[in-house]
A protein has these predicted regions:
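Catalytic cores of nucleotide-enabled group-transfer and carboxylate-activating enzymes in metabolic
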Residues: 7-9, 14-20
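Polar, glycine-rich mid-to-C-terminal structural blocks
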Residues: 22, 30-33
Length: 178
């Protein structure tokens, strides 16, 4: 009874089937509610997934969080990708197209690092791949050794990159059980 009186008083509109999502109320239009739902989806895909931890931290030094995620939302919206599945490799292309259309070597290295940290993969997507000597890490003989233009120091979710005089090679290995 209390809920019903609140619904009427505040003019809540919600979907009639589970999960009973809010559509609008007297202070939030349906359009604003949909925008928030899409913004949350983009935030989950890029930030909460931790797939772009280093690139996002780098960008947050230059632009505010709302601008960052709004730009990703605009890209997804303009390409018909909202609330639709996207391949993992495609996320990295979208991120690069949105923020690094002509990536610097630092931006390219950050995206490579993000990909290698987030994916248990033995290859980079085409947009991040560079000529590699085809070597693998001696310890497991399958983890690729990837060329970078920077010396990299990781501290939590922050990556400190320092321009290297020569190409530096790194292998990002994941624990077997997690």
């Amino acid at each position: 009874v209390l809920f019903r009186s609140l619904v009427e008083k505040e003019k809540y509109q919600y979907s009639s089937t589970p999960p009973y999502e809010l559509i609008s109320h007297q202070n939030l239009s349906a359009e604003e509610g949909l925008y928030l739902k899409h913004f949350e989806d983009i935030f989950d895909r890029y930030y909460n997934s931790k797939r772009f931890r280093f690139s996002i931290n780098y960008l947050l030094e230059k632009i505010d969080p709302n601008t960052l995620f709004s730009r990703l939302l605009e890209h997804h919206d303009s390409h018909g990708l909202l609330m639709n599945p996207v391949s993992l490799d495609e996320y990295y292309r979208i991120f690069q197209d949105t923020f690094y259309p002509a990536p610097t070597s630092m931006e390219q290295d950050l995206l490579k690092l993000d990909y290698l940290y987030a994916q248990r993969s033995f290859r980079l997507p085409q947009i991040l791949a560079s000529k590699s000597p085809g070597k693998t890490w001696k310890k497991d003989r399958k983890t690729p050794v990837i060329p970078f233009n920077h010396e990299i120091e990781i501290c939590g979710s922050q990556a400190n990159l320092k321009v290297a005089a020569n190409t530096v090679y790194y292998a990002v290995a994941h624990a077997q059980n997690g």
